[in-house]
Each structure stands twice: as C-alpha cells, then as structure tokens.
Regions:
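Conserved N-proximal alpha/beta basic substrate-recognition cap immediately N-terminal to
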Residues: 11-143
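Extreme N-terminal starter segment of soluble prokaryotic enzymes
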Residues: 1-4
C-alpha cells in the first residue's frame, strides 16, 4: 500500500498536534509507504496526475495527552524526490492550509484527473473548490 500526502512544507508542520502527521503515522503503522509532496509539485502529463514526491519514514511517536503526541526532534527522514504517478497510489490525501491560491486551485484540478474508483482522493478536489473550509466563512458575513 502506498499513500501520498499533498501537504505544506514539512518543516512548517507541528508533528505534536498536526492531523496530517497523525494520518501519516496511522498509515505507516499499518504498513503503508508514505509519500509526501506539495501542491506546486503536481503536474498533468498525458492526462494523468504526477507528482515530484519523496518517500517518508517517520520516527516513532507516542500519545502525550491533550490530543498531542511526543515526537523526536528529527521526526522524519525523506528520500530524494522522484516522479510518481498519483493514480498508482492506494490513496491521495490533499492536506494543505491557506492560502487558497493559484497553486492550490491548480492542484485540485490536477487531482481531478485521478479516477476515484481506482485511487480515492481525500479530500475531494471538487468539494474543496466548491466549499473550501478556508473560504466558507466568507459566505456568512453576519456571523
């Protein structure tokens, strides 16, 4: 099983509480290869979604209470980047934070090229464009 995560730069994630890191640990704990990339590293090639990605290995972690984890200072290692076809992954997680910019929108359009019957994309790119959690509040200015 190979799972790709489209995330923000790893150095900006807080591994003690970040849910993307928690999902990576859960995947690795179940024997999956964890691959990481960023939105601007996705591309469409001959109608397929491809990413420049790195295989990630996570240092062990353990629960610390208050929904946090105790992690090593060097909480991951990664391989050299290589091109991978995202439709050959077992699943792809879209896990980036704002801004919702051109790279983000383009990444969701590229992820649309993946057949969800073959490779699930979590969070659905169409849903992210139609109802982004980062922009949804703008629809309710009175709140």
């Amino acid at each position: 099983m190979r799972i790709a995560f489209v995330t923000d730069p790893l150095g900006g994630l807080d591994p003690s509480i970040d849910t993307s890191v928690g999902l990576m640990h859960a995947a690795a704990g179940r024997g999956a290869e964890v691959w990481v990339t960023q939105a601007h590293l996705l591309e469409a090639v001959h109608g397929r979604a491809r990413a420049l990605a790195r295989r990630m290995r996570l240092a062990p972690s353990r629960p610390a209470g208050d929904h946090r984890w105790t992690v090593a200072k060097r909480w991951y290692t990664v391989t050299e980047p290589r091109h991978v076809w995202l439709d050959e992954m077992s699943a792809v997680f879209m896990r980036t934070e704002p801004p919702v910019d051109q790279a983000y929108v383009t990444a969701t359009l590229i992820l649309d090229l993946i057949d969800p019957a073959r490779t699930p994309v979590i969070n659905d790119p169409r849903g992210l464009r139609a109802c982004s959690e980062h922009l949804l509040g703008l629809r309710f200015p009175d709140l």
